[in-house]
Amino acid sequence: MSKAVVFGSFVVDLMARSPHLPVPGETVKGSYFKMGPGGKGFNQCVAAHKAGADVVMVTKLGKDTFGKVATDTMDSLNMPKEHLLFSDTEDTGIALILVDENTAQNEIIIVPCALNTIT
């Protein structure tokens, strides 16, 4: 079995679709919302795990609801959690993702939070 260590981000994705992306100052009514686990590092870790690799994730989470999303997701996939780091002062990172449902164009804002404190 292949072995891998992924040192990267876990964020909770907050994704909304709308008929078009807002221009500055505009409010747009959305048509769909989904919240779920994400982050480039976490997505790579899950892909390697599902491909059969013995993989561990090194990332930093907050001790908050979104940190629980990370640990619950890893539990559901039977992924090890012993290398997760936790911040006492910062929240788990998030990604705000806006998607135009007609063109699939997106705009993403990443708020790293606890990820900024990895040392």
PLM regions and their residue ranges:
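Conserved N-terminal subdomain of the carbohydrate kinase-like
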Residues: 26, 35, 50-119
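Glycine-rich phosphate/adenosyl-contacting loop at the front of the ribokinase-like
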Residues: 1-60, 67-69
